[in-house]
Every structure is written in structure tokens, then in C-alpha cells.
Amino acid sequence: MDKRKIKKSKEDYLEAILIRINKYGACRVTDIAEQMGYSKASTSVALKKLEEEGCIIKDDWRVLLTDQGYAIASRIYERHNFFLEWFQCIGISKDIAEADACMIEHVISDESFEKIKEYLNQVREK
């Protein structure tokens, strides 16, 4: 499998966990599977890898983010929300903005993202 696909998948899982915890205070394997549209079995396999990488901790019924997992998830979630809002502000439909934000959040470099944010903040201040 392509490294970018693995990275995207990992980031999507971590982002889904973060969103679920922020919204409901807890997150279960079944919640993640439902949210992402995957089977519980394939979700469990992916979460096992994330646990081995030190990104999550699983107990009997819930999934928690480690500091490392939280940092990755927060970074991706910030990018997603930034691009979603920006795209909608410039007139892109919500569905297309959502899809494009979801793609860009995984591939844009930290440097490019920060420069775009700085530029748009300067434009807003004028």
C-alpha cells in the first residue's frame, strides 16, 4: 500500500476519534466504524496498528488518544476546519468544500499551511 494512503488512513482514524471524544466525551470502536463507514473488524485492525504506534490506548470499551495521537489529530482537524471554512467563504458548496478539505488536510506541508493562514489573516485585517 502507498505510504500516503497509510498516512491518510491513520490521520482519518485519529481525527475521527478526536471528533467523537470532543462531541460525546468518549469513543468506542463501533462508533469509529460507523462514523467512517468501515466494518468493526477492519476498524479494529487499524486501531491495533495505531495502538502499536503509540497513538491511542484501548481499554475494554473505549479508545483514547495519547499525547502523540492527540497532536496528530488536532493538526489534521485544524487544517480540515480551516480549509472547509475558507472554501465555503469563497463560494464553494459545502459538499465539495468538505471533500476538498479532507484531501488537502493530508498533503499540505506545515510550511505552506502556516503561510496560507498568515496571508489570509493579513488580508482579513486590511
List the model feature ranges, each with a label.
Residues 2-38:
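N-terminal helix-turn-helix DNA-binding core of bacterial DNA-binding proteins
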Residues 13, 32, 43-51:
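Basic amphipathic alpha-helical segments that dock to polyanions
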Residues 41, 95:
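Key DNA-contact positions within bacterial/archaeal DNA-binding proteins
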Residues 51-60:
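A short, conserved structural fragment
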Residues 61-79:
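Basic, amphipathic "hinge/linker" alpha-helix immediately C-terminal to the N-terminal HTH DNA-binding motif
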Residues 75-89, 96-103, 111:
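Short, solvent-exposed amphipathic helices
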Residues 99-126:
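C-terminal regulatory/oligomerization modules of transcriptional regulators
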